Amino acid sequence: RGELVLSFDRSVTYGKLIKKVCDINEVGYDIKVPRQLGKNMCVPYGATLNGALVPNTVTKSLHTEKTFTPSLMDFDFRKFPNYMDIRNQIKVLSSFRKPVILIDDILHKGHRIKALDPLFREADIEIKQIVVAILSGQGKELMDIQERDVEYIYFLPNLKNWFNENSLYPFMGGDYVYREGSSDEYILPSINFILPYASPGFVRNTDPENIYTLSETCIKNAIRIFET
């Protein structure tokens, strides 16, 4: 018995997410002149659509970053460098006085939404809908527990592992690591969870040889990209 490997193109999922948000907000896909805005606002809270504008929809990104401790054994969610702290960002969202449509690329373990949910409730912000590109069975259970309504592009009931290709390639992306006393606000300390930098601890129940193969492939791909 084997495993099914699926690849998702970000540009395709972006287009489908934007259409779904427009449908929920009951607005057209083309920008109207003069502007005719929907009654809900769109809030990307991860990397997906961050900094983008949804047609005919008030769009305001929530700038958060998954941040690992120096030991790489734990992480939490903090403001992205050079932005206000998350609580103040949410207060800004509250000032619009509009129901919110939250957007992210995937809802699986739900660490980010679990960290943000108490802050949204504290600010008394109405979450009209959560929209994700990919929803797993575990993510759906979490939304049932939080009594949140979630829409998705793709539903994967049995998702084993999720890889963000960009974060695995050295010098091209990575996961943010908090460093005490770091003075450069424009170069973020980061780590790629591949060997020899760090072991991908989220990959379990597999032959160690597979970890070496994954790491080697990522490094070779990064080299090829830099050479082109």
Predicted regions mapped to residue ranges:
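PRPP-associated nucleotide enzymes
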Residues: R1-T228
